[in-house]
């Protein structure tokens, strides 16, 4: 009897221990799965901003990294930004935003007394702008080289002297215009345009060399940062070099052009004179032909006069004498060269 009772106790004890072993394994598995959630819950609890455990587990089910959201909430709470809740962080993450960047930007802006709320920060982040870098630029202004590739801004004063200069523009981010505002390239282009215009408005290049700060002042007064994502704090001219004498070069080119025009006009007049001369020669040849024709008609007219009795022998002799005198005078009037040719 005692033997049977001992066997029953051993069998029941084995089942009990097996049940305890299985239960321990299940508990270990459950603890390994939810242990990280419990750790995050405890971390939030001791930080003074408790988050329900089931809410943390739900983040994982919604494909939201719980550690990122919990750490962001703790950082905001410790920084004094207690009006931003876990739901806001989850919504921004699901919208494709960068929660850590937004949180760091909000904390930095709050410490630097820069007006930036959660709604605007998330809008800037979702627009594709780096809100963290923008706030850092607002706190620590950055310097932009103009031009930004090591070249020069070239302008020409009214006296024709070319000036090559470089400038440095100190800017900080304009949070209000960060979404939709023009970028750094626009600032560089506008500053370059303003410097060229200011140099071009100077009477002489010496005025620019003597007072480069006047150029900076004129450029700043134009409000070049309107509709951009930056506020221009200062424009400093760091280098000015003399270039070519563009005015003299232009005058030289103009003089050469005038010479070519004058030569063309002279050639045109010469050609017209030659053409007129040839035309006059043609007229002379025509008149000579008419003269020869008229002279050929004289003997016929004289013969007709003899037949009709209108011309006598004495009249004919007188005409011959006059013709001889005329030939003699013509011979005396000819140059020596014409006489030799004859």
UniProtKB/Swiss-Prot annotation:
Bilayer topology annotation: Multi-pass membrane protein
Main location: membrane
Presence of keyword Membrane: yes
Superkingdom of the organism of origin: Bacteria
Subcellular location: Cell membrane; Membrane raft
GO cellular component: membrane raft; plasma membrane
Keyword tags: Cell membrane, Membrane, Transmembrane, Transmembrane helix
Annotated transmembrane regions: 18-38, 39-59
Function, as annotated: Found in functional membrane microdomains (FMM) that may be equivalent to eukaryotic membrane rafts. FMMs are highly dynamic and increase in number as cells age. Flotillins are thought to be important factors in membrane fluidity.
HAMAP family on file: FloA (MF_01562)
Quaternary structure, from the entry: Homooligomerizes.
NCBIfam families, per database record: PRK13665.1 (NF010186)
Protein name: Flotillin-like protein FloA
Origin species: Protochlamydia amoebophila (strain UWE25)
Gene that encodes the chain: floA
